[in-house]
Regions:
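Flexible "arm" and connector segments at domain edges
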Residues: 1-39, 43-101
C-alpha cells in the first residue's frame, strides 16, 4: 500500500467519523456504536500508516500522553485558554520520539 493511498484512507475514515458524530449529535445516544466503529476504523488506518512507515505508534502515543500530562500548572490542574484548549504549563516537556523512527 502506498503512503498516498493510506493517507486517502485516513481522510476517508475521518470523513466517515465526522458523519457518524454529526448523526449522533442530531439523533442521540442510540447511535454511539456507529460513531465508535468509525473512530476505531480511523485509528486502525492510522496504525496501518505507522506500520508502513516502520513507526512505533503505541510508544509514541505513550510519550505524547506523558508530555500532555506535563502541561499541568503548578497546582496540578490544567491551564485553559478561553476556547478551552489546554495550554503548556511551567513543567511542560515535549515528547522525544527520535528513537522511534
Amino acid at each position: 500500500m502506498t503512503r498516498s493511498y493510506q493517507k486517502d484512507l485516513i481522510v476517508e475514515e475521518f470523513k466517515e467519523f465526522l458523519e457518524a458524530d454529526g448523526f449522533l449529535f442530531k439523533h442521540g445516544a442510540n447511535h454511539q456504536e456507529d460513531c465508535l466503529k468509525e473512530l476505531a476504523d480511523l485509528v486502525y488506518v492510522c496504525y496501518q500508516y505507522a506500520e508502513n512507515m516502520h513507526w512505533f505508534l503505541d510508544a509514541a502515543l505513550d510519550r505524547v500522553h506523558q508530555s500532555n500530562m506535563s502541561k499541568l500548572g503548578e497546582d496540578g490542574k490544567p491551564i485553559y485558554r478561553e476556547d478551552g484548549k489546554v495550554l503548556k504549563g511551567p513543567s511542560y516537556k515535549p515528547p522525544d520520539l527520535s528513537d522511534l523512527i
